[in-house]
From Swiss-Prot:
Species this protein is from: Tolumonas auensis (strain DSM 9187 / NBRC 110442 / TA 4)
NCBIfam families: PRK05751.1-4, secB
Keywords per UniProt: Chaperone, Cytoplasm, Protein transport, Translocation, Transport
Gene Ontology annotations for the cellular component aspect, listed alphabetically: cytoplasm
Membership in a protein family: Belongs to the SecB family.
InterPro entries according to UniProt: SecB (IPR003708), SecB-like_sf (IPR035958)
Self-association state and partner proteins as the record states: Homotetramer, a dimer of dimers. One homotetramer interacts with 1 SecA dimer.
Gene Ontology process terms (BP): protein folding; protein tetramerization; protein transport
Domain of life, per lineage: Bacteria
Protein name (database record): Protein-export protein SecB
Any GO molecular function: unfolded protein binding
Function, in words: One of the proteins required for the normal export of preproteins out of the cell cytoplasm. It is a molecular chaperone that binds to a subset of precursor proteins, maintaining them in a translocation-competent state. It also specifically binds to its receptor SecA.
Length: 157
């Protein structure tokens, strides 16, 4: 009975230790002129994630959102938010750990980053900006498929 208990694989563990804003930037380089123009904005959202190992089974995941708003050729505003979290992820195989850090954690961080962006845009006296939800699972799957295709292509050459 003791042998069976010792041979049982450890259960996967996941825990949020902390969520915080790591960096924030807001620029409105063409104010007040842009306030007098017709509001037909072109919004561009760029996202990036970085992962850093902090200790055994402890990771920092940082999600960076860069929102650029243009009116024609002029930049109305540029907003960048780096939202980060410290997570414990233990007893996961490499594939599940990669998914956890590359999709699950950014999915947790996104609402916080979206709220920070909305607040900054509002404080800049611009119309409300609500970023649409992001499917991080699909983005992660696409990224893995792209990596596998590149590896297959490199193996063929």
């Amino acid at each position: 009975m003791t042998e069976a208990a010792n041979s049982t694989p450890a259960q996967p563990e996941f825990q949020i230790q902390r969520i915080y804003v790591k960096d924030v930037s807001f620029e409105a380089p063409n104010t007040p002129v842009v306030f007098q123009k017709e509001w037909q904005p072109e919004i561009k959202l760029d996202m990036d994630t970085q992962t850093q190992v902090l200790g055994q089974d402890v990771y920092e995941v940082a999600l960076t959102l860069t929102v650029t708003c243009k009116l024609g050729e002029e930049t109305a505003f540029l907003c960048e938010v780096k939202q980060a979290g410290i997570f414990t992820a233990a007893n996961l195989d490499a594939q599940n750990l990669a998914h956890c850090l590359g999709a699950f954690c950014p999915n947790i961080l996104f609402p916080y980053a979206r709220e920070t962006v909305a607040g900054l845009v509002s404080r800049g006296s611009f119309p409300q900006l609500n970023l649409a939800p992001v499917n991080f699972d699909a983005l992660f799957a696409s990224h893995i498929a792209q990596l596998e295709a590149e590896q297959a292509k490199a193996g063929v050459q």
